[in-house]
Amino acid sequence: SASKGSGGDLNNGKIRVSKQNGLSDSMLGYSTSKITNKEYEYDFNQTYKELSNQNLSIRNSGSIALDLSYIATGRLDGMWAHGVKLWDVAAGLLIAQESGALISNFKGDPKYLDADHFVCSTPKVYKSILKSVKPYFKKLG
């Protein structure tokens, strides 16, 4: 659990994100949706391809809430997701953030709650994931 400004905790003990130093040997999660958004285009396959060419593991648990909890407890080093609904991710994002994760939308804007996409990870993995997502995300209009 977590409350803003108080950190994350599990079974009365403080939790923190992993101390992973970079993408190499990290474990990432993802969530994707076939729902189209009229405000942007995003090529998930290109991001996946770029990241999978690194020395890391990528998985999809099928549960964004579980993945965010795993980031908060150091079991997963980061994730990227698009096509999400705020009510599905808000609590998990707060727990991850309070446990030391960095979070933004795909453009790097920390106002991720206004978007249906985000990157969430340990501080030293964050920029690498964002760098792999950004080129394939394009605002329309």
Language model features by range: what are they?
Residues 1-68, 116-141:
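Acidic beta-strand-loop-alpha-helix segment within the catalytic core
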Residues 69-72, 90-98:
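Hydrophobic residues within well-ordered alpha-helices
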